């Protein structure tokens, strides 16, 4: 039987293989209990084109492990992505449930110009 982390990593691996087959930019989300991170990665997978996290100087002053902070990261990654000329991405939630902080980040990114 799988433990929780192994099951999450298995889901993430399947999702990444599917996105790689599509050949589009990928918005990757990683979360820890204290912070949330987002990166836009090139279709080849070898280059990070934009990144944002609660460790950024503009977001570090507030709370970093809640839904509001995740929404702020979503807004920031959308702004940085559109300034880099990226509007269409595939959402890679890294095996995490589409709920809570992951959902808040995705919704904020959509509202600020990224298309999933």
Curated annotation (Swiss-Prot):
Source organism superkingdom: Bacteria
BP-aspect Gene Ontology terms: translation
InterPro entries linked: Ribosomal_uL18_bac-type, Ribosomal_uL18_bac/euk
Keywords (A to Z) from UniProt: Ribonucleoprotein, Ribosomal protein, RNA-binding, rRNA-binding
Assembly, per entry: Part of the 50S ribosomal subunit; part of the 5S rRNA/L5/L18/L25 subcomplex. Contacts the 5S and 23S rRNAs.
Function of the molecule: This is one of the proteins that bind and probably mediate the attachment of the 5S RNA into the large ribosomal subunit, where it forms part of the central protuberance.
Protein's name in the database: Large ribosomal subunit protein uL18
Organism of provenance: Psychrobacter sp. (strain PRwf-1)
